[in-house]
């Protein structure tokens, strides 16, 4: 008796933030993404070799917010990604050297904080809003990374008690 299995298209659309890219070969990247519906996932993606090809390396720039289709298989180390598009193209982050440095630092920080984190819509929303604010803001970003890290502590389960704040006090772990 032969059995024929029909697999439905299991691609699910989700938003994702690029946290790490690693060149695997001339035509492939290993990307780590924090997604809205699955938390941290890793995928091997093919990049276009020609300048006119779709899906070039620019779409996988650190902290890009993407809309993608994922065939999520919980038992697999690498998830299969279908269509990908940038939801909010950065206007200033890639072109402003200060913001570019801050974004590289934050990508590394977030990767290390979230690599074992599961699905958390509140974290994803916080990150998406914070990154959009960074891109749109002209001034006052000198301490953005510090404020963002401080606010992330609440999501990670520890945060400073500021109820008894005084000017001579300081945060000491």
Residue ranges and their predicted role:
Residues 1-6:
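Extreme N-terminal basic, low-complexity initiation segments
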Residues 7-29, 34-173:
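Non-catalytic alpha-helical scaffolds and adjoining flexible linkers that form interface surfaces
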């Amino acid at each position: 008796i032969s059995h024929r299995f029909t697999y439905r298209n299991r691609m699910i659309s989700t938003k994702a933030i690029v946290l790490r890219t690693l060149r695997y070969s001339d035509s492939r990247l290993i990307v780590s993404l924090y997604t809205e519906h699955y938390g941290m996932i890793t995928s091997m993606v093919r990049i276009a070799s020609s300048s006119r090809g779709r899906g070039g390396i620019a779409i996988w720039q650190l902290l890009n917010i993407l809309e993608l289709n994922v065939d999520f298989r919980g038992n697999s180390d690498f998830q299969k990604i279908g269509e990908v598009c940038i939801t909010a193209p950065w206007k200033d982050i890639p072109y402003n050297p200060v913001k570019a440095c801050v974004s590289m630092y934050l990508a590394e920080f977030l990767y290390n904080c979230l690599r074992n984190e599961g699905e958390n819509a509140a974290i994803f929303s916080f990150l998406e809003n914070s990154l959009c604010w960074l891109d749109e803001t002209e001034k006052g970003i000198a301490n953005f990374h510090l404020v963002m890290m401080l606010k992330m502590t609440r999501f990670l389960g520890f945060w400073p008690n500021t109820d008894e704040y005084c000017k001579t006090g300081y945060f000491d772990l």
